[in-house]
């Protein structure tokens, strides 16, 4: 079977929230008011004083975590612990932080990921690979290039495929330029050695 035509593929306007590397990022669906509404609920719930002074979440547990940059509370998952510090992953934005125990709170089950799905959409540039952002100059340059491509502005994403919940996308800017192709042309990304394009519409 031939791959389906581009015009039949799902498209969405995305606003990026976190760049992992030059081909991997997290985003929100543009103009989705549910993120702000959820954040209000989380802020109100997590600001309450900690009733149990011995609270100490384990790796893999979800919780409230107070982000170092803006001191606001967000839903998070504990990734790891080293001595008195916890590395957390923010479920609704895709970024990470290292915080101390006093910046963690239990998460109300009604706000947990089982009740309300994480709002950060994990995406990869379809069929492309990059050096890790912290691995040599090429990886850092690729991450900066993806970040500079209309950061903070909605960008059209054409969904080429899905892989274990991750969207494989082609990004198109306002000038209808193909960001994926531009990053490859600049030598910042390379095409994966092997991949199989979907030959049926995404459901």
Where are the model-predicted features located?
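Intrinsically disordered, low-complexity segments and flexible domain linkers enriched for serine/proline
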Residues: 1-203
């Amino acid at each position: 079977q031939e791959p389906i035509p581009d015009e039949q593929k799902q498209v969405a306007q995305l606003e990026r929230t976190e760049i992992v590397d030059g081909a991997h990022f997290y985003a929100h669906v543009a103009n989705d008011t549910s993120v702000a509404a959820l954040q209000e609920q989380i802020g109100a719930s997590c600001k309450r004083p900690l009733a149990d002074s011995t609270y100490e979440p384990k790796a893999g547990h979800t919780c409230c975590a107070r982000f170092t940059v803006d001191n606001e509370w967000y839903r998070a998952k504990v990734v790891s612990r080293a001595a008195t510090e916890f590395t957390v992953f923010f479920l609704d934005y895709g970024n990470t932080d290292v915080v101390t125990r006093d910046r963690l709170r239990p998460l109300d089950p009604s706000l947990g990921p089982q009740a309300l799905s994480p709002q950060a959409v994990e995406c990869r540039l379809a069929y492309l690979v990059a050096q890790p952002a912290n691995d040599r100059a090429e990886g850092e340059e690729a991450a900066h290039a993806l970040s500079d491509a209309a950061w903070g502005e909605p960008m059209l994403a054409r969904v080429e495929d899905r892989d274990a919940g991750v969207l494989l996308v082609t990004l198109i800017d306002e000038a209808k330029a193909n960001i994926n192709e531009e990053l490859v042309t600049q030598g910042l990304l390379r095409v994966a050695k092997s991949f199989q394009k979907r030959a049926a519409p995404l459901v």
